[in-house]
């Protein structure tokens, strides 16, 4: 069974974990209703995508 020969220090552990964070999603604005939305997705508030009404919004 594989066992580490030396204890991993807090510095080495934290340097390894430096890239494990989640990045914030890019937020764009809807050109029709000016609400914030995720790119390449239908707008939640007005239901439009690429200038066309795709989904009936409530």
Curated annotation (Swiss-Prot):
GO terms for molecular function: structural constituent of ribosome. InterPro entries: Ribosomal_bL32, Ribosomal_bL32_bact, Ribosomal_zn-bd. Residues 1-26 are annotated as: Disordered. Pfam families: Ribosomal_L32p. Gene3D superfamilies: Single helix bin. Residues 1-16 have a biased composition (Basic residues). GO terms for cellular component: large ribosomal subunit. It comes from the Bacteria. GO terms for biological process: translation. Belongs to the bacterial ribosomal protein bL32 family. This is Large ribosomal subunit protein bL32. The gene is rpmF.
